[in-house]
Amino acid sequence: MRIATWNLEGKWTPRHHWLIRSLRADLLLLTEVLDKVAIPGLNIHFTEGEMQPGRRWAAIATNAPLRPLPDPHGATALAEVEGFRVASSILPWRNSGGAPPWNGHDQGSRTAAAVTSIRTAGPLVWGGDWNHELTGRLYAGSTEGRESILGGLDHLGLSASTDASPHRLPGARSIDHVAIPAFWTVASVERVSAIVDSVELSDHDAYFVEVD
């Protein structure tokens, strides 16, 4: 099974569709998704809430049957896919502010609050734009936020296969992640550039995890 995540930055063109198809993913954990996005052959479920008109916080797309579930948090989509729960999330960035869907006085406390809600939903696969490096130096994330995410993963029995994946920026590590059960066997983890034909499709690259 191949699981991918990509922050679309609220854009959708034929090039975006091409890159999505090139990932050959069975399960897509998308963030900053226009609600007009449709991918032939894939079922898709969006968050109820919008970042701004026409742009949803997150979505889940899959070639398998999908049963939408209520959002456990305003910036997280949740669905049941082939009997297990899948979540796709945006977690707070440094200057996200405290307006809904965030709750807290800074990035760390807002992340902790979001993770608590997501953890309660019990996803078996969880990913998206977490705005935190999980290993190495913190450029985008916070210490408290990282600790909350890692604690949530441990509680759920998950491991972020992307924790050491490179960011597009030299020397930095990914803030986009895919977490799966710690006992699953990972065949490969790859970053896929979102710069196609010298055109930046998004300010985030895509990542996929291949599971045996």
PLM region spans:
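Active-site regions of metal-assisted phosphoester/phosphodiester hydrolases
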Residues: 1-5, 9-17, 27, 58-212
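N-terminal, active-site-proximal structural segment of metallo-dependent hydrolase catalytic domains
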Residues: 1-42, 50-52
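Ligand-binding grooves and catalytic loops that recognize ribose/phosphate and carbohydrate rings
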Residues: 34-75
